């Protein structure tokens, strides 16, 4: 069915009569879209709806909300009147008046009651002020007579203050104590005398000079060690002397002797000249000497190391 056919009044009436449209569509609020609003009809419908709601509430609570009183006769619920103090504070915060629930405010009411009484004494005080000017001439006569007596009583009290007595006593005592103090001033004079005494004390400073005395004792040991090293160098094969700069694994006895000799040769100088004299190598030999220490030399025999490994490390 198209929208044009729905605009005809006859079609709308037939649909409403059949009950095809829902109930809300047949109300005056929906019909107002197609014509003027009938306010009287709307008010009648509103009253009818409110009456239905009131009837439902009365049946549910057995209470007449329009008259604000319970329904007479036995019912599902029974209402009893109780004192307001016995009701919990939650229910005393609001009160139902007709169909509106108002919030109770006990504090503002108490404040209003407390403020109102002071207004009456204020009015009385104003009346007293009005009467006061009439009594003023008689009041000042006894007032001056009563005020002067306390003045002489308070005046003598500060007079016997012990301040002036304590001042002269404390002053001479302080002067007498401080006067003899500056007398021992010449005491600092003998101070420079003891300063000259400790001056010669630093004389024994040159004593540490003889410390290098052990040098002559170490000379025979160094010479003996040099001879032992030269003997070991002479017994090594010629191939090891040619590749003396290549690092390798030293023998057990040789490593021990070289370790002991290195500790003693740290202070010796002649071995440096001997080492520089034997350090002449060619370019290919230097490339072969770049092999790391853990790896054996490709040209050296397995198990045979160089004796000059320790001196070369010491020079570097």
UniProtKB/Swiss-Prot annotation:
<dbReference type="GO" id="GO:1902746">
    <property type="term" value="P:regulation of lens fiber cell differentiation"/>
</dbReference>
<dbReference type="GO" id="GO:0004860">
    <property type="term" value="F:protein kinase inhibitor activity"/>
</dbReference>
<dbReference type="GO" id="GO:0060669">
    <property type="term" value="P:embryonic placenta morphogenesis"/>
</dbReference>
<feature type="repeat" description="6">
    <location>
        <begin position="198"/>
        <end position="201"/>
    </location>
</feature>
<feature type="region of interest" description="9 X 4 AA repeats of P-A-P-A">
    <location>
        <begin position="156"/>
        <end position="213"/>
    </location>
</feature>
<dbReference type="GO" id="GO:0050680">
    <property type="term" value="P:negative regulation of epithelial cell proliferation"/>
</dbReference>
<feature type="compositionally biased region" description="Pro residues">
    <location>
        <begin position="181"/>
        <end position="217"/>
    </location>
</feature>
<feature type="repeat" description="4">
    <location>
        <begin position="184"/>
        <end position="187"/>
    </location>
</feature>
<dbReference type="GO" id="GO:0071514">
    <property type="term" value="P:genomic imprinting"/>
</dbReference>
<comment type="function">
    <text>Potent tight-binding inhibitor of several G1 cyclin/CDK complexes (cyclin E-CDK2, cyclin D2-CDK4, and cyclin A-CDK2) and, to lesser extent, of the mitotic cyclin B-CDC2. Negative regulator of cell proliferation. May play a role in maintenance of the non-proliferative state throughout life.</text>
</comment>
<feature type="repeat" description="5">
    <location>
        <begin position="188"/>
        <end position="191"/>
    </location>
</feature>
<dbReference type="GO" id="GO:0044877">
    <property type="term" value="F:protein-containing complex binding"/>
</dbReference>
<feature type="modified residue" description="Phosphoserine">
    <location>
        <position position="268"/>
    </location>
</feature>
<feature type="region of interest" description="Disordered">
    <location>
        <begin position="124"/>
        <end position="153"/>
    </location>
</feature>
<dbReference type="GO" id="GO:0004861">
    <property type="term" value="F:cyclin-dependent protein serine/threonine kinase inhibitor activity"/>
</dbReference>
<keyword id="KW-0131">Cell cycle</keyword>
<feature type="short sequence motif" description="Nuclear localization signal">
    <location>
        <begin position="278"/>
        <end position="281"/>
    </location>
</feature>
<dbReference type="GO" id="GO:0140678">
    <property type="term" value="F:molecular function inhibitor activity"/>
</dbReference>
<feature type="repeat" description="8">
    <location>
        <begin position="206"/>
        <end position="209"/>
    </location>
</feature>
<dbReference type="GO" id="GO:0000122">
    <property type="term" value="P:negative regulation of transcription by RNA polymerase II"/>
</dbReference>
<comment type="similarity">
    <text>Belongs to the CDI family.</text>
</comment>
<dbReference type="InterPro" id="IPR044898">
    <property type="entry name" value="CDI_dom_sf"/>
</dbReference>
<dbReference type="GO" id="GO:1904030">
    <property type="term" value="P:negative regulation of cyclin-dependent protein kinase activity"/>
</dbReference>
<dbReference type="GO" id="GO:0042551">
    <property type="term" value="P:neuron maturation"/>
</dbReference>
<feature type="repeat" description="3">
    <location>
        <begin position="180"/>
        <end position="183"/>
    </location>
</feature>
<keyword id="KW-0677">Repeat</keyword>
<dbReference type="GO" id="GO:0042326">
    <property type="term" value="P:negative regulation of phosphorylation"/>
</dbReference>
<feature type="region of interest" description="Disordered">
    <location>
        <begin position="181"/>
        <end position="260"/>
    </location>
</feature>
<feature type="repeat" description="2">
    <location>
        <begin position="160"/>
        <end position="163"/>
    </location>
</feature>
<dbReference type="InterPro" id="IPR003175">
    <property type="entry name" value="CDI_dom"/>
</dbReference>
<feature type="repeat" description="7">
    <location>
        <begin position="202"/>
        <end position="205"/>
    </location>
</feature>
<feature type="compositionally biased region" description="Polar residues">
    <location>
        <begin position="223"/>
        <end position="233"/>
    </location>
</feature>
<keyword id="KW-0488">Methylation</keyword>
<feature type="compositionally biased region" description="Pro residues">
    <location>
        <begin position="139"/>
        <end position="153"/>
    </location>
</feature>
<dbReference type="GO" id="GO:0035264">
    <property type="term" value="P:multicellular organism growth"/>
</dbReference>
<keyword id="KW-0043">Tumor suppressor</keyword>
<dbReference type="GO" id="GO:0033673">
    <property type="term" value="P:negative regulation of kinase activity"/>
</dbReference>
<dbReference type="GO" id="GO:0055123">
    <property type="term" value="P:digestive system development"/>
</dbReference>
<dbReference type="GO" id="GO:0001822">
    <property type="term" value="P:kidney development"/>
</dbReference>
<dbReference type="GO" id="GO:0030099">
    <property type="term" value="P:myeloid cell differentiation"/>
</dbReference>
<feature type="region of interest" description="Disordered">
    <location>
        <begin position="278"/>
        <end position="316"/>
    </location>
</feature>
<protein>
    <recommendedName>
        <fullName>Cyclin-dependent kinase inhibitor 1C</fullName>
    </recommendedName>
</protein>
